[in-house]
UniProtKB/Swiss-Prot annotation:
PTM-bearing positions, type Phosphoserine: S14
Post-translational note: Phosphorylated.
Keyword DNA-binding tagged: no
Chain spans, region Disordered: 1-53
Gene symbol of the encoding locus: SSB
Modified residues (N6-acetyllysine): K8
Ranges of Basic and acidic residues composition bias in the record: 1-13, 29-40
Record's protein name: Lupus La protein homolog
Cellular component per GO, a single term: nucleus
Organism: Oryctolagus cuniculus
Location(s), subcellular: Nucleus
Biological function: Binds to the 3' poly(U) terminus of nascent RNA polymerase III transcripts, protecting them from exonuclease digestion and facilitating their folding and maturation.
Length: 53
């Protein structure tokens, strides 16, 4: 299922740029859900051991 998560991450990555445009609300929420499902994404974003949480 890593491939599926990677695809999702790419989608969020694209939305991340739009998120700065003023869509931080929905995008941030979706990202949080993804982070919970794939800790690897969180690790790459924070690299602060967030994957442990």
């Amino acid at each position: 299922g890593k491939v599926e998560f990677q695809g999702k991450k790419t989608k969020f990555d694209s939305d991340d740029e739009r998120n700065e445009n003023g869509a931080a609300g929905p995008v941030k929420r979706a990202r949080e859900e993804t982070d919970k499902e794939e800790p690897a994404s969180k690790q790459q974003k924070t690299e602060n051991g967030a994957g442990d949480q």
